[in-house]
Regions:
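Ordered core of a single globular domain
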Residues: 504-508, 512-537
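N-terminal export/assembly segments and adjacent metallocofactor-ligating motifs
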Residues: 1-250, 254-306, 316, 322-324, ...
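Acidic/polar loop patches that form or flank catalytic/metal-binding clefts of enzymes
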Residues: 247-251, 346-349, 362-364, 387, ...
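Short, polar loop motifs at secondary-structure junctions
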Residues: 209-213, 551-557
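A short helix->loop->beta-strand "cap" motif at the edges of active sites that frequently abuts
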Residues: 198-204, 538-547
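A glycine-rich, hydrophobic/aromatic-adjacent loop/helix-cap motif
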Residues: 335, 351-504
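Conserved small/polar residues in nucleotide/adenosyl-binding loops
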Residues: 571-578
Length: 588
């Protein structure tokens, strides 16, 4: 009898392991990169990472192909032919950096806003935003401005955070999980792990998506909504839940601004503002006295209905009454919205009934004493086991901001935010807009050879925070934070090239793009963008964007239109210190 040879079933694939974060999608999973003789041999999930807990998808595993792609840029280059021709010659890092300094130094000395610096994916935004601030230009923004900023901003302004990086559903207690327009590249592995938990427990999964693919393929029910009409569907659900009384009144009174008094004084300057006391604290109607009282007073039990007179004219009513007036109308009846959303009135009512049943017939009770924000003590925690997730599918529309706010409002009406079984934030969220920085870039915040007077991106709270001049004109090249787009929390990267070419609101001298392939990915106008990048001034013959620096890891479409190309690191590259020591001159 022959003896079978001993086979090593777990051979060592590496002599070194580096830990990093995967950038193959927006999920940001932790990975272990195995190297042998300095070469990447294998990529696996990091079991100690909180995002993916060791899970890695096929795209993440294929990161090795990205690292060794033949399209990787190997050295700095300068353009020697017309823009778009792809004619370059390699140059040294010393020459490349000196060229960049020669172009940028005069701008910082004379007028920093003549530099427009815009980046792609936001993983490096802490560094790139800081660099822009130190340079002194207000013209900085990142990828989010034409991706899912409506979701992030809508969430921050409504409840202090949105989905994805802000938190996640309570996978262990949720009874009904609804996905609105979710693509597989946002929160990929955590969502898959969560869906696995739900399916194992027998919880329901509903998909609202124009196509039944990906996650929708494993859902228990699918609503094929007409693209761009999710908000109308959501508001119809709001109407049905309010009509049926299936909303969490106690939650709204205690933890939202539903009882805050709003001034109704048509034509007056204070119309639509919150009623405040002399200290600026928002007021509610005290159920015991029927009079206004600070919403922060622990002794006050606020009312959701009522009316009080306002000194100087008009009345003030709870915000909840304005919501009821707006949505308890025939405009949002299922029969009225059905033709537009592509879903029958009967099915819309069924979805509302499913929400109500999960939230109120299956409420979660945890016998755990706790103290709320007012200092009031409670014997138990009561949760509404309904959770939701949405991203670009509902946000990337002209009505995306308000659609996202409607979805967050629906969660609040059900009482399913920051409650057992619902959506749970992770630190440091929730953070309301006033806890975030305000954007800097007003004329008094921009000065030669001086850092910008604050962060270039942020959240405006009123007209006084807009980045405009004394005449009301936009001060940023993308017109973000102006009357054109006052709540553009991540800036508007997709407007940069067209505005710079048009000289509206002004011209720029240098455009610096980092990992941002705008020649290809620019509001579905790639041909127009390529034409703009090569457009010349008829009087001078010079390009309307005089100088363009581009930093990327690959020879993308944008590289062909750059004047100076700077290779960039990948997430699988050595550390910046190692990279600099091996590839850059000491003078850099």
């Amino acid at each position: 009898m022959s003896v079978e040879p001993i086979v090593d079933t777990a051979p060592a694939v590496s002599d070194e392991v580096r830990k990093t974060t995967c950038y193959m999608c927006a999920c940001r999973c932790g990975i272990n990169v195995h190297l042998r003789d300095g070469k990447i041999r294998y990529i696996e999930g990091n079991r100690d990472h909180p995002v993916n807990q060791g899970v890695l998808c096929a795209k993440g595993s294929a990161g090795i192909m990205q690292h060794y792609s033949p399209a990787r840029l190997q050295s700095p280059m300068k353009r020697v032919g017309p823009r778009g021709s792809g004619q370059f010659e390699p140059i040294s890092w010393e020459e490349a950096l000196q060229t960049a300094v020669d172009w940028l130094a005069p701008i910082r000395k004379d007028d920093p806003k003549k530099l427009a610096f815009f980046t792609g994916r936001d993983q490096s935004q802490a560094l790139t935003g800081w660099w822009a601030q130190q340079f002194g230009t207000p013209n900085f923004a990142a990828h989010g401005g034409f991706c899912s900023v409506n979701m992030a901003a809508g969430g921050i302004y409504t409840l202090g955070g949105a989905f994805w990086e802000f938190g996640s559903p309570d996978w262990d207690l949720t009874e009904l999980f609804i996905l609105f327009g979710v693509a597989e590249d946002h929160d990929s592995n955590p969502i898959k792990m969560g869906l696995g938990k739900l399916k194992t427990r027998g919880a329901r999964v509903i998909s609202v998506n124009p196509v039944q693919t990906g996650y929708a393929a494993i859902s228990d029910d699918w609503y094929g909504v007409t693209p761009g009409t999710d908000g109308l569907l959501i508001l119809s659900l709001v109407r049905e839940l309010m009509r049926a009384g299936k909303i969490d009144i106690d939650y709204l009174v205690r933890y939202t601004n539903a009882p805050w008094l709003v001034i109704r004084n048509p034509g007056a300057a204070n119309d639509g503002l919150f009623l405040r006391d002399a200290d600026g604290t928002q007021q509610v109607i005290d159920r015991a006295t029927g009079k206004p009282a600070p919403h922060t007073d622990a002794k006050v039990k606020a009312a959701l209905q009522g009316e009080v007179p306002v000194e100087g004219g008009g009345v003030a009513v709870p915000a909840f009454m304005l919501m009821a007036d707006a949505y308890l109308t025939d405009e949002y009846a299922p029969e009225a919205v059905a033709p537009q959303v592509g879903i029958s009135a009967e099915r819309i009512r069924q979805l509302a009934a499913d929400l109500a049943e999960a939230a109120f017939a299956k409420e979660v009770v945890i016998e755990q004493p706790w103290t709320d924000w007012k200092g009031e003590k409670h014997d138990r925690m009561v949760g509404r086991p309904v959770s939701m997730h949405a991203m670009r599918g509902i946000s990337a529309h002209s009505n995306g901001f308000q659609t996202c706010r409607a979805l967050h409002m629906l969660q609040l009406l059900l009482g399913s935010v920051e409650a057992p079984g619902g959506f749970r934030f992770k630190p440091p969220y929730p953070k309301p807009p006033h806890a975030h920085p305000k954007p800097a870039g007003r004329p008094d915040q921009v000065a030669p050879e001086t850092p910008l007077g604050g962060a270039p991106l942020g959240y405006v709270l009123g007209p006084e925070d807009l980045i405009i001049g004394a005449d009301g004109a936009p001060q940023r090249i993308d017109k973000a934070y102006s009357w054109d787009a006052p709540m553009s929390a991540h800036g508007m990267m997709h407007m940069v090239i067209s505005n710079a070419v048009a000289g509206d609101p002004y011209k720029v001298d240098v455009m610096f793009m980092y990992m941002a392939n705008m020649a290809w990915n620019s509001s579905m106008n790639t041909r127009g963008v390529m034409d703009m990048l090569t457009e010349t001034d008829p009087d001078t013959g010079e390009y309307k964007i005089p100088k363009l620096i581009y930093s990327d890891a690959y020879s993308s479409e944008m590289v062909a239109y750059a004047d100076l190309v700077l290779p960039c690191l990948l997430y699988t590259s050595p550390s910046p210190r190692d990279y600099a020591a091996s590839r850059m001159p000491s003078s850099a």
